[in-house]
Amino acid sequence: MYSSPLCLTQDEFHPFIEALLPHVRAFAYTWFNLQARKRKYFKKHEKRMSKDEERAVKDELLGEKAEVKQKWASRLLAKLRKDIRPECREDFVLAVTGKKAPGCVLSNPDQKGKMRRIDCLRQADKVWRLDLVMVILFKGIPLESTDGERLVKAAACAHPVLCVQPHHIGVAVKELDLYLAYFVRERDAEQSSSPRTGVGSDQEDSKPITLDTTDFQESFVTSGVFSVTELIQVSRTPVVTGTGPNFSLGELQGHLAYDLNPASAGMRRTLPSTSSSGSKRHKSGSMEEDVDTSPGGDYYTSPNSPTSSSRNWTEDIEGGISSPVKKTEMDKSPFNSPSPQDSPRLSSFTQHHRPVIAVHSGIARSPHPTSALHFPATPILPQTASTYFPHTAIRYPPHLNPQDPLKDLVSLACDPATQQPGPPALRPTRPLQTVPLWD
């Protein structure tokens, strides 16, 4: 469990996030925030941070509370989950956790069909490519936002344009990097009092290469504030260190539903057979407008809609963001199961008055039509008019069981005696009696 249970909202308790959170490097929080602080300082003062100021910011970020880092990582994972195609989310979790061989994980493209860019901080002025974010988040490699050209996809990657699998992404090492690595290695060898023999030509293999420290210092200036040892150490530290969520992949596979009710005791995540509380969608901070559609592209469910609810993770993977029930499934529902005596009347009723309602595939349907519909005492979502339900009154088929709690509503809607008086009907009037004028 988290050391501070109230620090996370219901959005950070998704199994996708809980499974990946222990694999996020704590260095990612420090790195993204450090780059943002440097850009903000430059815009405000029109000059770069001094080494002392940058080092102070680095120490401040490294000493941040674990709850803050975990909350930031959870929000970023929720944003990444939204940008990963639903059919690839499960494979992504299994690959990162080591339960499955890594395969291509496709992301949703931008309007030009290329890799999307997202912001990694709130109110950030910088956007990062998704593959860059994945490398920094799960490998702890200090890359700049302009280092997208240095990323190289593996030969086994079948979709190099949109794949964000961290195991398929590498960093191209240039000659300059190798040259600098030589001096770093020699410096570490001198500090450990164990000089090494450098790599030279065939005639100079037996001769040690001496390190000209003066020439190195005159040619290169270190711009960062991380030392080599410190950089390697912090880049390997996970964001969850001993206080992570009480979650395992076996628990995820054994329980497919989850409860996002923040009012539970101690914020402990329960796993009932159904879920009732609504979940709020994150707004992705990308350069392009986010157009959220289901894989079919035909339906979209409003977050303010009464049918919005937390759904099964596996169903979310198979059905996408909003997966409406097929017509055959609606026909099998208790509301569309006519009794023998009502079949003729119902067939004519449902043919012309069948309610058109988009229903989530994750909403549990009871096998008994007499089951009561339980709603929370307080509304989960604000009572606003939804554009997806233009009619305020919905007619239901008149074959509901008398014990159904909707009986009063149905009888009120279907009883002609209780209908609102409409315009007066035109009745045939008595024929006028014609009286001859000549009588």
Curated annotation (Swiss-Prot):
Region annotation Disordered: where it falls in the sequence: 265-348, 415-439
GO cellular component terms, semicolon-separated: fibrillar center; nucleoplasm
UniProt tissue specificity: Highest levels in skeletal muscle. Lower levels in heart, liver, kidney, lung and brain. Very low levels in testis and spleen.
Coiled-coil intervals, chain numbering: none
UniProt-listed GO biological process terms: DNA replication; negative regulation of transcription by RNA polymerase II; odontogenesis of dentin-containing tooth; positive regulation of transcription by RNA polymerase II
Modified residues (Asymmetric dimethylarginine): 365, 395
Compartments, record wording: Nucleus
Role this protein plays: Recognizes and binds the palindromic sequence 5'-TTGGCNNNNNGCCAA-3' present in viral and cellular promoters and in the origin of replication of adenovirus type 2. These proteins are individually capable of activating transcription and replication.
Domain notes from UniProt: The 9aaTAD motif is a transactivation domain present in a large number of yeast and animal transcription factors.
Protein name (Swiss-Prot/TrEMBL): Nuclear factor 1 C-type
Source organism of the structure: Mus musculus
